[in-house]
Amino acid sequence: MAHITRFETPWFLVISKKQYKWTVRPNAGPHPIEKSIPLAVVIRDYLKLAETVREAKHIIFDGKVLVDGKVRKDYKYPVGLMDIVSIPSADLYFRVIPDNVRFMRLSKISADEAHYKYVRIMNKTTVKGGSIQLNLEDGRNILVDKETAKSFKTLMTLKIELPSQNIVDSFIISEGSYAIFVGGKNVGIHGVVKNINLSKFKSRKYSVITLESKDGNTYQTNLMNVMSIGREKSDMRVD
């Protein structure tokens, strides 16, 4: 189905449900449909660079829009958390970050910042030849040797260069590190990790993380909803 009614769209999409009956349905891709924004909606409703889907299509089909450093000409391409949306011809660069009100929002960044993406390791697998494949949250994979793989843990965040995928840095959730909630009722809250309560009877992903925001309030959620984005302070722009 190419389109869905606006009333069937995810609650967080920034679109007017009274203006038109139909809107764009995102294609299958690196992010779940229920957690993604169609590229045409990003251009029209989030960035206000077009008034209609047709106008947004022209911008996209002209090859002016990049997602994670690659030109995307699919107007239904699913854009999700931590993706980099770039329009170099207009000197516009954005990172999709968690938001406590609308789940996701586009944060304006510099051209230099747009060269880097933050993405979590969801699991690791051994491939033919003995190399280890790091399977990342946005569907991409990175091959490393066995020795290097030992330093990478599940749910660790990688800072990768775009579009090469070279690993520039990595961040693990630990007490004193900086993190942001990417799921749960407090999505978008960020601050310093104060405590990690490891689950005794369930897998590590159910560990409870306590985070203290810059206003001094504390919040808790399970590890699956937390993304490390720095050591003592955030490595990326979050405000």
Swiss-Prot record:
Q: Does the keyword rRNA-binding apply?
A: yes
Q: Which SUPFAM superfamilies match?
A: Alpha-L RNA-binding motif (SSF55174)
Recorded GO molecular functions are: rRNA binding; structural constituent of ribosome
Q: Which Gene3D superfamilies match?
A: 2.30.30.30, 2.40.50.740, RNA-binding S4 domain
Record-linked HAMAP family: Ribosomal_eS4
PROSITE patterns assigned to the protein according to its UniProt record, in alphabetical order: S4
In which family does this protein belong, per the annotation? Belongs to the eukaryotic ribosomal protein eS4 family.
Give Gene Ontology CC terms. Answer: cytosolic small ribosomal subunit
Query: Protein name, please?
Result: Small ribosomal subunit protein eS4
Arranged from A to Z, the UniProt key words for this protein are: Ribonucleoprotein, Ribosomal protein, RNA-binding, rRNA-binding
- According to the entry, every stretch annotated as the S4 RNA-binding domain falls at 37-99
